[in-house]
Amino acid sequence: MDFEDLIYTKTEGIAKIIINRPHVYNAFRTVTIKEMCSALEDAEIDPDVRVVVIRGAGDKAFCTGGDAEEAKAGGYNQ
């Protein structure tokens, strides 16, 4: 699976989801939410996955919440 805002890997029963937007402290936007849902659904249906690890890229923040720029441009109505 290829994602724009996430890095998603599965190895030895561990699914790793990394929010990969460190330039905005991993703030989520509509794309991020849709991709997160897809990755979690994939991990859920994979019988080999026993654990899901979610983290943010970079060393400054896990996730600061919603992306203010997207909210200003019309919000999360997509």
Model-derived features: positions:
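Glycine- (often His-adjacent) and acidic-residue-rich active-site loop
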Residues: 56-78
